[in-house]
Amino acid sequence: MFASKLDSIRERCSYRKTILPKYETEILTVLSFYPELDSTRIIFKEATIKASLNARPKVGSLFFRRRKNRTYVIRIKPNTEDSVATLDQAGFNAAVGVLGHELNHVVDYSNRSIFGIIGRLFNYTNKKGKRKYEAEIDRMTIEKGLGWQLFDWEDYVFNKSNAKVKYKAYKKDIYYSPEDLKSLINQGNPKN
């Protein structure tokens, strides 16, 4: 039964997507929450990056394609010895939660002009701007119905992963803690 549901989700959600087979179930599951991205080009790939995951538009598609034809890349850090918290060590729900967070970056970028995206980049030049932007993305994730999955990711990062103290301190400065997420989810209105 699950296989037939996965086939149905794959048929609907994999159009214009490059999906890593290793994370196919998690990626297809989270894509099913984002019908507005059904025709959006998204490449999921492993990459050596400092963060666990990140999402961004492909630079060439910003300049040479219309907004609806842009390509976005979600980069996933593979498990290495110097690793931060990684997707392959998190549970299914945690993986779905953080992938949902990254897809909300894609939703945000897809609704912006090139100048709006550049403005978002400026948010990342200071801690206050970065914190505000990531809080907005987390609230979007909760509004999509993925709050508990995002909670599982943050709980994994802070309490179960082998992430270094420095990485956990960075996460604490920028992102909601598991307790903050639980409070927002229980409020039922993440805009408060």
For each feature predicted by the language model, list its residue ranges.
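Short, flexible/disordered intra-domain loops and linkers
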Residues: 14, 85-90, 121-126
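Post-HEXXH active-site segment of zinc metalloproteases
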Residues: 93, 108-138
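Metalloprotease/metallohydrolase-associated module, dominated by Zn2+-dependent proteases
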Residues: 124-192
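Short alpha-helical functional segments enriched in proximate histidine and acidic residues
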Residues: 102-106, 140
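Active-site scaffold of zinc-dependent metalloenzymes
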Residues: 54-93, 109-110
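Stable alpha-helical elements in mature extracytoplasmic
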Residues: 23-26, 95, 133
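Short alpha-helical catalytic segment bearing the HExxH-like zincin motif
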Residues: 94-102
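A metal-dependent hydrolase signature that marks the N-terminal structural subdomain at the beginning
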Residues: 1-65, 191-192
